[in-house]
Swiss-Prot record:
The keyword Nucleotide-binding applies. It comes from the Bacteria. Residues 22-91 have a biased composition (Gly residues). Residues 374-376 are annotated as: G5. It comes from Roseiflexus sp. (strain RS-1). Residues 263-267 are annotated as: G2. Residues 238-245 are annotated as: G1. Its main location: cytoplasm. Keywords: Cytoplasm, GTP-binding, Initiation factor, Nucleotide-binding, Protein biosynthesis. InterPro entries: EF-G-like_DII (IPR053905), EFTu-like_2 (IPR004161), IF2_II (IPR044145), IF2_N (IPR006847), P-loop_NTPase (IPR027417), Small_GTP-bd (IPR005225), T_Tr_GTP-bd_dom (IPR000795), TF_IF2_bacterial-like (IPR000178). Belongs to the TRAFAC class translation factor GTPase superfamily. Classic translation factor GTPase family. IF-2 subfamily. Residues 92-108 have a biased composition (Basic and acidic residues). This is Translation initiation factor IF-2.
Amino acid sequence: MSDMQISGYQSAINARHYIQFAGGGRGPGNPGGGRGPGNPGGGRGPGSPGGGRGPGSPGGGRGPGSPGGGRGPGNPGGGRGPGGGRGGGRGGDGRRRDESFVENEGGRGNRSGRTTSTATTARTPGGLARPTTTVRAPVRPKGPIALPVTMTVREFSEATGVGASEILKALLKAGVVANINQQIDYETAAVIAADFGIETVEYVPPQLEGVVENIRDVLAAQDPKDMKPRPPVVTIMGHVDHGKTKLLDAIRSTRVAESEAGGITQHIGAYQVELHGRKITFLDTPGHEAFTAMRARGAQVTDIVVLVVAADDGVMPQTLEAISHVKAAGVPMIVAINKIDAPNANPDRVRQQLANAGVIVEQFGGDVPSVEVSAKLKKNIDGLLEIILLVADLNEYKANPNAPAVGTIIEAEMDRTRGPVATVLVQNGTLRLEDNVLVGSTTGTIRTMFNDAGKRLRFAEPATPVVILGLHDVPQAGDILQVMPDLAVAREIALQRQRKQRLEAMATSRGVSLDGLFSSIQQGKIKELNIILKADVQGSIGAIEHALSQLNTDEVQIRIIHRGTGTITESDVNLAIASHAIIIGFNARPDPAARRQAEQYGVDIRFYNIIYQLTEDIKKAMIGMLEPEYREVTEGFAEVRNTFRLPTREIVAGLYVTEGKISRQYNVRVLRNGVVLHDGKIASLKRFKDDVREVQAGYECGLIVEGFNDITPGDTMEFYRRERVERTV
């Protein structure tokens, strides 16, 4: 942390004062804080009015004739004794003070390591001494102070030394209604600080350039010579009750790694199996909901998806959902036709249904492998694993085991006895005990590491899932784990991420909206409109798809990435987040969880009950997606009568406007014998010595063409402007 920021935060600490009350004096010869002999607390020595000490006592006050807090006999308290000096100071009273040393009118503080506030003695109606106190104002820092990207009003007050009430008033004047615990961003804080004459700079934590935000970028940056083959990472998806969990159990029970045999099985969200000495990592989070929830947070952990379809039930609604999610993720798919032992099993019917859903298996001439299995009988499990290894060989999954480890959190929880517990899938490098790690917005040091068999490990190589202990807080699923050389730097980055998360929480929207598409397209961000379509009945889906297909152009495509009937679910919203899609509900509404998720992440959900209204809205959005089209409008012609060369070597063309007019805003073409020599802009346009904006037909003028000097008498110049043409779908 910079010295500027430390001084900014420290100024608030220096502003806290502890009020001291003037007590009695002490006995003769003792420093202040006690009383004179025989006097009650708070009184004086013989002949002294209240607030002093016994005769001859050093400290807060003195006896008659001595300089001190009280006067001699007959004098009212607070002045001097006969011939005395200034009002007395206090002795040490044991109360907390600051390092500062303050000299007050009523006395002189001692350097006791505490702050002294201004105190004087007043008289109560009963004649007793009463202390009155003035608290010193907060000390404002000199020079610029460093402020984080977000902070509370209280933190801002402490950093700047400006009272919280003053800050709240300034915020109110600026149109911001806040309380002392309200978060404000740096821009707002800087404006308010400037109002109080305080200069600020935004604090940036060190070494942010080394922070991993995307594991794919890490892998792409590795030297190909350092990359080694790694096990594939597999997720199993499918319709409920089609046997996803049973298939996982069957795989695990038949092919658990031999080195782990006899261990105590731990549920850690992922595990490894072996076939022919090669490992395969399975994520034990079946279902596309978990898969897409992690994708929505930017996590890319799955290499291959196994789609489980029951041979007796065939393709079901959640099967179609899973297919949509896999296609959106762009990962290879293997179809596992399960329950082939069922009496009414029909694998060929399943393959035909998959073809109708756009998944063409190899038996039908496609490129999607399929295998028939029975999780119940543990039949053909090895066949499925062999196909997984074959797909892995084709895709050549690799990582660098010698790099500092990076990985993704699969799941995490707070354990009562062990503290934060997280399962991490190492994706590059090797994770080791005692590594300092940055995980999302938390940090820690790897104290313990074990696998799904409960075996303690000293290190974990790429594609290995392990449980780690030693984090300071519970991370979120999908957070990136990164080994850091310096734990202090990791903590600083984690703090910055926490502040950034608070700032993002203040934002109203992060998702794609139909209203925002026009500007997004103009900025070149989107050329494809992704839609998730949910309707009341299947017939409505077909009609809407047909209507939307009529709107496609060569430049803009509507892509329905998922379609289904019934309620809009949280899974739909997660897919929309991951795919930057809009959800359209045709006589379909979201459930409460989906509504909350959509509001949190700014996903646009549109509701319709008339197809025409739906297509009109989409058409308006697509118009903004079309490339702008321009046409030329010729405004005038001129003949080159003469040319002059300037000292700057630029050529001035002496023109006679033969038709229309010339304007500085127009483009110009230089033609010779009907051939275009140059097409560009006007650098200068003058009549005599004066700059002019335009010249009408029948007048002469001088003109310089920007960046072009090959002009001779007899050339013709054409002047035109470009006019935007509104596009239609």
